């Protein structure tokens, strides 16, 4: 069976080389190692440079230069470094160990193993005939891998012939920004702790995943009872796994968003891996709460691992990036609406709290899929969410009809999250799964658009709930505690969401009264 590569403490270097021609496996190269980095120059480039130098010397000695040779000589003599500077820039993270990801990855290369591209100089020369140009946008491809391309956008103001010089100057400056480029690709370093390697996300083999103890959350949600029992999980049913999974997801996301200062941008079921064998015994990670599981006081790995950082972006990288289509910033992703997934369509730019919103969607989907339709608990959850959206329940409507109505309502609510809709007071029975209130909190987070760090810091460190506590930090099970996820020190009540839970009278059936508005979320407990 395929065994996962151990990326712990694995150093990452970067291949940085320049080329006028695409680099192929068969291309002869000159290789030099400098400071544990490998510099590759294709032999063709060296031969061309030597030929150019020889031609220049011959031309200078003979003094028989035509116009083309004069132009070439002037360019080579005046811009001795420009020939290399205008070549393609390739920054490739390289592991010291040999790994293989998929079928296209070469030995020792990871993710960004494709050669970069630049616009043809001749094409730039053709643009010089335009007399006036206010702004010219030029995209430089700085990386390409399994999950798309990453561009660096250059904006130059120009008029007439100066356009050519400015664009060439911008390309030369790219070669001097190696440190900045490494910051862009620094997301690849996260694979050492946050990336679970498989043979390919699109073709994960169920037997291999079970053999090594990991399954994707998407697989876990789509299993039937027979498949789930074959996993030999210590849990008797999947509903028991909800709290441990969410707890571990929050810790992993905390490590990504806060500690490493990244936004994942693609948090979905297929990119979350769960170790079902350690989920029941794993305690909250002490210290930093790293998603790798290496806390200051514990050697236990976090049972939930985030994967596929192809869309991740470092928050403080001072380079503007474009998506695959060259659009500024990143557009939000589209998730399809079926039994296991929501359909979320929005054209707004992704912000640093996008991962928080995706986490709320995951909780919503886990709730509806871990509890099968037709059961009493599932029906109660669906009815509650429908009431939350102000939808009256038809007495003759069955679980499937209510579920379909809920999908439409929830999808519309997300799509119109900037609306000024005022929700009404809801009274419902307390026998519903407590996790249902959490999705309301996350929806409220996204409506108020708080900073991602505020939410995660509150989830992890609010009151006594820290990474040293075994209780899931997003659940409050002590009647003396308050749940203040935004800012515990804030004097503005409208910016604080309270969630309290009284479990002292387990035999009683209390009634919950929830008042939900766009600016506040209060939950009071009234025993009948």
From Swiss-Prot:
Map out region (Disordered) in residue numbers: 49-84
Give the GO molecular function terms.
ATP binding; protein kinase activity; protein serine kinase activity; protein serine/threonine kinase activity
Highest taxon of source: Eukaryota
- Reaction equations catalysed: L-seryl-[protein] + ATP = O-phospho-L-seryl-[protein] + ADP + H(+); L-threonyl-[protein] + ATP = O-phospho-L-threonyl-[protein] + ADP + H(+)
Comp. bias intervals (Low complexity): 49-77
Q: Does the keyword Coiled coil apply?
A: yes
Q: What is its EC number?
A: 2.7.11.1
An example Gene Ontology CC term for this record:
cytoplasm
Uppermost EC category? transferase
One Gene Ontology BP term is:
signal transduction
UniProt keyword annotation of rRNA processing present: no
List the SMART domains hit by this protein, alphabetically. S_TKc (SM00220)
- Kindly provide the name given to this protein in its UniProt entry: Probable serine/threonine-protein kinase DDB_G0282417
